[in-house]
Swiss-Prot record:
Catalytic reaction annotation: polyporic acid + reduced [NADPH--hemoprotein reductase] + O2 = ascocorynin + oxidized [NADPH--hemoprotein reductase] + H2O + H(+)
Membrane topology: Single-pass membrane protein
Entry protein name: Cytochrome P450 monooxygenase MO6277
Family: Belongs to the cytochrome P450 family.
Lineage: Eukaryota, Fungi, Dikarya, Ascomycota, Pezizomycotina
Cofactor(s), names only, from the UniProt record: heme
Record has Protein biosynthesis as a keyword: no
Pathway, per record: Secondary metabolite biosynthesis
Compartment(s) where it occurs, according to its Swiss-Prot or TrEMBL record: Membrane
Record keywords: Heme, Iron, Membrane, Metal-binding, Monooxygenase, Oxidoreductase, Transmembrane, Transmembrane helix
PANTHER family to which the protein is assigned, alphabetical: CYTOCHROME P450, N-ACETYLTRYPTOPHAN 6-HYDROXYLASE IVOC-RELATED
Highest taxon of source: Eukaryota
GO terms of molecular function: heme binding; iron ion binding; monooxygenase activity; oxidoreductase activity, acting on paired donors, with incorporation or reduction of molecular oxygen
Residues annotated as transmembrane: 6-26
Length: 514
């Protein structure tokens, strides 16, 4: 029997239409998630999220907030997933449990393009095994041993700020802080500092690269194959479609080659004059040397696995802490009362303006601690929702039965602006921590910038040491004024690219050193 091309196309089109219709009917009527409230269009198709995240540039997170106001604290946000905004805040610790088995959802984890890394690992037990190998490098004791390296980078940052005193030259502090955190994490990861603090302009291209990598998650969540496909394409073609991804791939290659040098036993950079790298004073205690000495199987010590781990360590280690430093700097400089109170505490603790801070002294300052906690709350960590799956237990929330295996997400943005837990939540108020009867310990339960549970951000100790030492040093030594910086444009979360971004029109939080 002979069929014309038009007949074949009609049959294929009809089959596709029947499949899509059946899929939509199943999702809306027969799927176990069909009982949960929420918009039907979003429950039927992922294209709704695609529209708000890709076309509207990172707006789906805000749409979720609107839906919660309309439908209540538990909603279905796509065909696979429910989202919870708990008015009491306590269910977060059930979803992000430290004792229960918690997988990641494959669809959500795929956005990172690093399935062999700790961040991208789906299975709970495999994640624990991989995490155990990294834990020693990020323990508090290990980070304390790293403080000479951290301190050397802070001193270099301050020397750059010293050069700018009295020049009336505005500085984008997000760039400067990103140079600081990058030089710290690259020294620790590879024993090779990338020396961004030496760049006269504070490496705006590097900061742009981090943003481009963050933006890419909007696409890779929807199309997991996209990143690997782009890697195999000619660079000219990649540049035609997305010039920013060339910067991301350059960094991936740089990380790949530096890890290869570690695998091949090379401790020093052979030609630092050509690649801008320098050896750091921690030759045998880098993160990747420790991974190679761990009990991970040989497969997890290959360049394929370690390269993915390196991408996540550098990206997370550089961007999230610099954002917190930037948010805190803005709120201090825009609030003379809070700034004055902090400076008084710093001056009492360190009479010598140019003295070197002891970590224990800095960590023991209550108001500085409150400033940091409040800054972390308003910087959010990840602006996007985080998703967990309880594969072995059914859960219950507010009378709703949640079948085991259901992807459940929650978002730091909504936890941190829960007015019941944090009254006047949009106000920068360190006293909510320092004046609490228990010193703010009860509020710590609801501060989820690093998430919670067995998959909590592994870099929490490093981030906090960087925050304490950097803020204590910079605000003890320098007098600054904001320059052409507007909260709504330059600080407020406007785009969720997994990590928070301000308005596209922002020139950054800029300051002038007096």
């Amino acid at each position: 029997m002979h069929y014309s091309p038009l007949t074949v196309l009609a049959l294929l089109g009809g089959t596709l239409l029947l499949y899509c219709s059946g899929l939509v009917i199943y999702r809306l009527v027969f799927d176990p998630l069909s009982k949960f409230p929420g918009p039907k269009l979003s429950a039927a198709t992922f294209w709704y999220e695609f529209y708000y995240d890709v076309i509207k540039k990172g707006q789906f997170t805000f749409k979720i907030g609107e839906w919660h106001k309309q439908y209540g604290p538990i909603i279905r946000i796509n065909p696979y997933e429910i989202h919870i905004d708990d008015p009491e805040g306590d269910f977060y610790h059930t979803v992000f449990s430290g004792t229960g088995v918690r997988d990641k959802h494959f669809w959500y984890a795929s956005q990172f393009g690093t399935p062999e890394s700790g961040l991208g690992t789906i299975n709970h037990h495999l994640h624990r095994h991989r995490r155990r190998a990294l834990n020693p490098s990020f323990s508090k004791a290990s980070i304390v041993r790293l403080t000479p390296v951290i301190w050397s980078k802070i001193e270099k940052l301050c020397s750059r700020f010293d050069e700018l005193r009295g020049t009336d030259q505005p500085v984008n502090v997000r760039l400067a802080y990103t140079c600081l955190t990058t030089d710290v994490i690259t020294s620790y990861a590879f024993n090779r500092c990338w020396n961004h603090l030496d760049k006269p302009d504070f490496s705006p291209v590097w900061c742009k690269t981090l943003v481009n990598g963050s933006k890419m998650t909007r696409w890779t969540k929807q199309f997991p194959w996209m990143l690997e496909t782009m890697k195999k394409m000619p660079q000219a073609l990649v540049g035609f479609f997305d010039p920013g991804m060339l910067l991301v791939f350059d960094v991936m290659n740089k990380i790949h080659h530096q890890i290869l040098d570690i695998l091949n036993g090379k401790q020093e950079v052979e030609d630092s004059a050509t690649d801008g790298l320098s050896k750091s004073p921690i030759p045998n205690r880098t993160i990747f040397h420790e991974l190679l000495k761990s009990d991970l199987p040989d497969y997890d010590k290959t360049i394929h696995h370690l390269g993915q781990e390196g991408q996540n360590i550098i990206g997370a280690g550089a961007d999230t802490t610099s954002n917190a430093l930037t948010v805190i700097t803005y709120h201090l400089l825009s609030n003379p009362r809070v700034l004055g109170k902090l400076k008084e505490e710093l001056e009492r603790a360190m009479p010598d303006r140019y003295g070197a801070w002891d970590l224990k002294v800095a960590e023991g300052l209550p108001y500085l601690g409150g400033v940091i906690q409040e800054g972390l709350r308003l910087a959010y960590g990840a602006s996007s929702r985080l998703t967990r799956v309880a594969p072995e237990e059914d859960l219950n929330f507010d009378g709703w039965f949640i079948q085991k295996g259901t992807p459940i997400s929650m978002t730091a943005l909504y936890m941190h602006h829960n007015e019941k837990i944090f009254p006047n939540s949009h106000t920068f108020l360190p006293e909510r921590w320092t004046d609490a009867p228990d010193g703010g310990r009860s509020l710590d339960r609801y501060l989820v910038s690093f998430s919670k549970g067995s998959r909590q951000c592994i870099g929490i100790n490093l981030a906090k040491v960087e925050l304490f030492l950097t803020l204590a040093t910079v605000f003890r030594r320098f007098e600054m004024d904001l320059h052409d910086t507007v909260f709504e444009r330059d600080v407020q979360l406007k785009h969720d690219f997994f990590l928070p971004q301000p308005s596209m029109q922002s020139n950054g939080v800029r300051v002038i050193f007096k």
